[in-house]
Amino acid sequence: MSSYRCPVCEYVYDESKGAPREGFPAGTPWDAVPDDWCCPDCGVREKLDFEPMPATAGSES
């Protein structure tokens, strides 16, 4: 699974964890998150501004 980071506040959306408080349960793929979804921490960035994070050693893809 992949992770995506907000370039302003460093919030990370991790597909394996989802964002339950935003209505996205664990396992929700990034493609299923609406394009107009904003960062839940800073609220100023839309999904298209999030940056994919490189896979780390030991992570499952």
Curated annotation (Swiss-Prot):
Binds 1 Fe(3+) ion per subunit. PROSITE patterns: RUBREDOXIN, RUBREDOXIN_LIKE. InterPro entries: Rubredoxin-like_dom, Rubredoxin_dom, Rubredoxin_ET, Rubredoxin_Fe_BS. CDD domains: rubredoxin. Gene3D superfamilies: 2.20.28.10. Residues 1-53 form the Rubredoxin-like domain. GO terms for biological process: alkane catabolic process. Pfam families: Rubredoxin. Fe cation binds at C6, C9, C39, C42. One of its GO terms (molecular function) is electron transfer activity. SUPFAM superfamilies: Rubredoxin-like (SSF57802). Its cofactor is Fe(3+). The keyword Electron transport applies. Keywords: Electron transport, Iron, Metal-binding, Transport. Involved in the hydrocarbon hydroxylating system, which transfers electrons from NADH to rubredoxin reductase and then through rubredoxin to alkane 1 monooxygenase. Belongs to the rubredoxin family. This is Rubredoxin 3. It comes from Rhodococcus erythropolis (Arthrobacter picolinophilus). The lineage of its organism: Bacteria, Bacillati, Actinomycetota, Actinomycetes, Mycobacteriales.
